[in-house]
Curated annotation (Swiss-Prot):
The keyword Oxidoreductase applies. Belongs to the bacterial renalase family. Catalyzes the oxidation of the 1,2-dihydro- and 1,6-dihydro- isomeric forms of beta-NAD(P) back to beta-NAD(P)+. Has a preference for 1,2-dihydro-beta-NAD as substrate. May serve to protect primary metabolism dehydrogenases from inhibition by the 1,2-dihydro- and 1,6-dihydro-beta-NAD(P) isomers. This is Renalase. Its EC number is 1.6.3.5. It comes from Pseudomonas savastanoi pv. phaseolicola (strain 1448A / Race 6) (Pseudomonas syringae pv. phaseolicola (strain 1448A / Race 6)). The keyword Heme does not apply. Its cofactor is FAD. Keywords: FAD, Flavoprotein, NAD, NADP, Nucleotide-binding, Oxidoreductase. It catalyses: 1,2-dihydro-beta-NAD + O2 + H(+) = H2O2 + NAD(+); 1,2-dihydro-beta-NADP + O2 + H(+) = H2O2 + NADP(+); 1,6-dihydro-beta-NADP + O2 + H(+) = H2O2 + NADP(+); 1,6-dihydro-beta-NAD + O2 + H(+) = H2O2 + NAD(+). InterPro entries: Amino_oxidase, Bac_renal, FAD/NAD-bd_sf. It holds the Pfam family Amino_oxidase.
Amino acid sequence: MTVPIAIIGTGIAGLSAAQALTSAGHQVHLFDKSRGSGGRMSSKRSDAGSLDMGAQYFTARDRRFATAVKQWQAQGHVSEWTPLLYNFHGGRLSPSPDEQVRWVGEPGMSAITRAMRGDLPVSFSCRITDVFRGEQHWNLLDAEGENHGPFSHVIIATPAPQATALLAAAPKLASVVAGVKMDPTWAVALAFETPLQTPMQGCFVQDSPLDWLARNRSKPGRDDTLDSWVLHATSQWSRQNLDASREQVIEHLHGAFAELIDCAMPAPVFSLAHRWLYARPAGSHEWGALSDADLGIYVCGDWCLSGRVEGAWLSGQEAARRLLEHLQ
């Protein structure tokens, strides 16, 4: 019997590792506490259509990742997004075009991880609470007390604070990962029946509780019945208001949006708030991935590199590369 490799987390990093390992002929089994794949790359189904509440777009600078993106494009899972960009600074809103190529999943960010997952075996709504090693193999324990295993190796592909809690069997790794701080982000979606009278489709914001806003319907393949917008608060504001109610967050960020936009703003017909507790790493690292190859445990995620989507994908590739190298 072939003993599979366990991968905890079905965001870009975990799925990138899974693809690399299955391409090399290995069996994997994925676990995720959510109901679907994607992590911060997931889209939220709502009365206002599919909303990208997490990652807004991504770029491809590394040659290997750019090749993967071109494959996704050929398969119809991603498209270029060319928004009319603005900048808000010192109380002034001004056009801010640039040459950056931006990619989005189509018809939502979830399309990418759904395609990457394919028909790989996965246990959703399964929160792993303990990772422990027997004489030969690894086993996982979930929040319901159910045991999963055996597994030959374990890859943990979650935000750093969640990974730390699963590394009791690898104290050296745990101490490194425990030092990684991640910043929160409050995200709010607002939808309007009548489109806002502004050409703006994306905006980088300074001197405000807001950090970024995007006109969701301007992305390829999105539902355009309503004029939906996604607002991201700054890490600082999000941390200061971490335990605020969703209603308070919506009210405050809606107000900040109304202050910066250059047109009248009616009352939204739909609003939604989501708190990303671990939205992005507070600093960048150059680890690629972390591992204790002798134990057979590996850790990857965007926080091992740049904190970007590309960083997550590359980190998953690196975790798989190290595992395969050790098997040789």
